[in-house]
Amino acid sequence: MLETLITKYRALGIDKQIDYDKFYLYSLVTHSTAIEGSTITELENQILFDHGISLKGKNLDEQHMNLDLKQAYEKAIEYAKQHKPITTEMLISLAALVMKNTGKEYQTMLGDFSSARGELRLLNVTAGVGGRSYMNYSKVPMKLAELCDMLNERRAKSATMSVDELYQLTFDAHYHLVTIHPWADGNGRMARLLMNMLQIEFGLIPAKILKEDKEEYIKALVTTREEDNLDIFRTFMSAVMQKNLQNEIENYISSVGDVPEVHDEGVEYQKSKPKKIKSKDKIVALLKDNNKLSAVALAERIGISAKAVEKHLSNLKADGIIKRIGPDKGGHWEVVEFTGMANTIPIVKIME
């Protein structure tokens, strides 16, 4: 179901609209801060981000929360494009951006630390009044390092993973980070940021958690933790993703009107006929973004058979557009020359 909706979303060209990447980023920021109590809307953030105009009736902390998270996302997107290894130091640097103007200094028996600098907590915290305590602060550095190692190991295998498996990996990253709770504040924003950073790296549509889903979102996290069952959070996130995609598709169709009919076998245009992106162009675009993708992974992303992909790869190689570096197993592709429509392939890249 999720993969079908993504195919329809991209076939309709929703992510090819002017300034789509910018506005999707603004939406991610707005909804993430709304979960934490911000009342700033997407339109208000557009004014704040694009024009630097202070918002009447909104306190400075709210505005700083949104401005800081936007800056953190921009840095995370850079890391995603560069396929940087995920490390404790990287997460601390991102947390410092998230909490730059709203963090504070803490004084403890073990020493002082600052959430504004992204420093790991030196005190224990609970999930609200009467809630269960998160892991002891002394275990945080080790558990955070283990999480980074696990994510890097699974990222290395991403080229062979299905879309559903990739989303599950990003949902798991979110859950594990918020469960470790490395910081005194900003853990929720950081967990959603890490999830979205991975989704952007994998060429997925980043997941949004809307304010109206906050209660169910928190329940899913708590229940997953209590029952030690990741499938609970995975199922919740998949359902939220499906609902949001369906709503965006319906809103797009109702506002545009003249849109293509999307079928399992492809896209059929009724009135206007935009130039259809060829499979070979999609393959080249995907290889430019990730040169280690296998034929199976390419087939799944494009929606054709692996055998068809292999034929396209052979033709592209013969035409001198791509070449193979190293052996079939362990090697990678290099894009030599391309003048087709690769830049129009529907891969979510939030920042240009």
What are these regions (language model features)?
Residues M1-D185, R189-E352:
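FIC/Doc superfamily catalytic core
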